[in-house]
């Protein structure tokens, strides 16, 4: 995956969730990219999650909501929504009845597009 990212985006850190969940971030684990295989639904979720303090998550929601036209120009299937425990996510799902090579390739491509598109906006948000 790193080879598909620009050099300045290759220095991410990773954490594992449960068996079919991976998170990666650039120094703030509460704001992370996530890939999660929802086995029961047969879907692969790819997105940017805001799982920090409720006020920070709300500010992130407001920031990205005002930029959804820009986001959807590169990520047309992306949805922004409040989520569990006061969290927020900007994500999409892909069909994934099984984690086969085709699904993994699509997940990597989608995740790379999310990072390339959203990380500059996330950096701008964090400076605001």
Q: At which residue positions do the language-model features occur?
A:
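Short, intrinsically disordered low-complexity segments
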Residues: 81-103
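Polyanion-binding interface signature
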Residues: 1-87
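Ampiphathic alpha-helical segments that act as solvent-exposed interaction surfaces
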Residues: 1-2, 63-75, 95-128
